């Protein structure tokens, strides 16, 4: 029976085309998305956010994938070409990059539904029975095959993945739905200020994860109807879902119930949530297991030397405690505690780095103390700098301090030039 079930799901995934919406600005991340789209943002020591929905597709058996790009997409496209360009079309697999090309109108993508509509011919050429539309800006582990199976078994025309979240978290941030006892959706609001609570829990609501399954022809028809509606905002949550739930079978797919202990989803749309999700990775056994060989997270693998820790004097020791340190890093006579260092980070002597997310190609000079910080790519932290200990002083220096006291530092804030950095400087480990 298990073999039959696996074969059944594999047939469904082969008949599916996945479209990942990766054009979001991520404006709540402020300066972290000044030069990059949110899906291109770094996460977990070596990955980009876009790697997670792409890896979910591959691990679920979906190998026909389109990635819709728009906002500041250069670094995202470069990453996709370098890390995801190995698929072979002749074997029925591909990752296609779909920037706004204005083939159907003079406008850029005007909303999530319009982004799909403007690529309808590309989808049609693939002849899929089902189309999955996926969010490209969340960190999550999800077996799409199970969602496809539930979609087919329920007789749905559309299925929306959902999860229970606190009301205050959903307000103004997520689409919120109500369902009957069979999880058929009978109400939907996009980012309401006052979400409808669950009947059995007045403190929580059922929020959309932004992942959808459609029967292909039904999707095409709804996109055509929406394109002719001059009052539409061209958005699935604002327009299409509310317009179809009364007359068509649209079902919710409860993410937590199907994922079991392996279910993991994080919205990293703010500085605080981005920092918190990265900090989860330094736990001894994090909920998102990046070391699970049965569900690997794929990414571009830059060729780098191993991480190195040097000096063991009484007043300086290169060490990392409860931390993640990536290739190309040198921790020279400083202590790294409960932190993540992405590739090519150099930390010089006599420093203390705690609860920090250090993005690639950063250099931290001698005698620095950093705590609860995010250091953006390419920053050079001057000798003797202290950040995260006096938040008012940090604000006065031009750093961004989040609601929960996380300090974001970028090259612009340090008065350092932006652009032209392709690799970390060649720094002597004796410093």
From Swiss-Prot:
GN (gene name): glgC
Protein purpose: Involved in the biosynthesis of ADP-glucose, a building block required for the elongation reactions to produce glycogen. Catalyzes the reaction between ATP and alpha-D-glucose 1-phosphate (G1P) to produce pyrophosphate and ADP-Glc.
Catalytic activity from the UniProt record: alpha-D-glucose 1-phosphate + ATP + H(+) = ADP-alpha-D-glucose + diphosphate
Database matches in CDD domains: ADP_Glucose_PP, LbH_G1P_AT_C
Pathway where it operates: Glycan biosynthesis; glycogen biosynthesis
EC number: 2.7.7.27
Pfam family, one: NTP_transferase
The protein's enzyme class: transferase
Highest taxon, organism lineage: Bacteria
PANTHER family on file: GLUCOSE-1-PHOSPHATE ADENYLYLTRANSFERASE (PTHR43523:SF2), GLUCOSE-1-PHOSPHATE ADENYLYLTRANSFERASE-RELATED (PTHR43523)
Magnesium in keyword set: no
The protein, known as: Glucose-1-phosphate adenylyltransferase
Segments crossing the lipid bilayer: none
Family: Belongs to the bacterial/plant glucose-1-phosphate adenylyltransferase family.
Alphabetical list of Gene3D superfamilies matching this protein: Hexapeptide repeat proteins (2.160.10.10), Spore Coat Polysaccharide Biosynthesis Protein SpsA, Chain A (3.90.550.10)
GO molecular function: ATP binding; glucose-1-phosphate adenylyltransferase activity
Binding site for alpha-D-glucose 1-phosphate: 109, 175, 190-191, 208
Species this chain originates from: Alteromonas mediterranea (strain DSM 17117 / CIP 110805 / LMG 28347 / Deep ecotype)
One annotated GO biological process: glycogen biosynthetic process
Record's subunit section: Homotetramer.
